[in-house]
Design a protein with these regions (language model features):
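Catalytic glycan-binding domains that act on GlcNAc-containing polysaccharides
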Residues: 2-139
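N-terminal secretory targeting signals
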Residues: 1-5, 156-159
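Acidic carboxylate motifs that coordinate Ca2+ or other divalent cations, activating on Asp/Glu
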Residues: 142, 146
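A recognition module on extended beta-rich or small alphabeta surfaces enriched in W/G with H and D/E
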Residues: 148, 152-154
Length: 159
């Protein structure tokens, strides 16, 4: 089966992605695009966030997320990519049926509160007095440099 980024992974990986997406009601192309973006196009289960957040792997699992899934980022990093896909599925399972678009699938990774929201939903704002750091950490997603990062802007980077 041909899927986005399929030539960069093994046939077994591709098939597992397709199987996961059937269970989740998601498009395999969308999941592959998100994992390509999050892993710096490596699809490496051990790739770590360069900014030092502690995130690791195919969808950049944060330490607290790994713990909630019953593991650690070190254990995730030591897994094969195919084994880590079990945790990718587990992570998305609670949102099964709600990940119909690339934008919503990516929001489930970046900012889960935005799943199901309109494309102009504001994720981060430069002038947010309560959480200004959120914008700064994601400023690269503000394509039009207006000080606001919308759901659509964030997902454009994944396309």
């Amino acid at each position: 089966m041909a899927i986005a980024w399929g030539n960069t992974v093994t046939p077994a990986f591709r098939q597992k992605v397709v199987d996961i997406c059937l269970k989740l009601g998601a498009d395999p192309d969308h999941l592959m695009a998100c994992m390509a973006f999050e892993s710096g196009k490596t699809f490496s289960p051990s790739i770590r966030n360069a900014a030092g957040s502690g995130a690791v792997g195919l969808i950049q699992f944060m330490p607290a997320t790994a713990q909630a899934l019953g593991t650690t980022t070190d254990k995730l990093a030591a897994m094969s990519a195919i084994k880590q896909l079990d945790y990718v599925e587990l992570y998305f399972r609670s949102r099964a049926g709600k990940l119909k678009t690339l934008e919503d699938l990516y929001m489930a990774i970046l900012w889960p509160a935005a799943v199901g929201k309109p494309l102009d939903y504001v994720l981060f704002a430069k002038n947010d007095p309560k959480y200004p750091k959120r914008y700064l950490q994601n400023a690269g997603l503000d394509f039009n440099k207006d000080g606001v990062i919308t759901k659509a802007e964030a997902a454009d980077k994944v396309r």
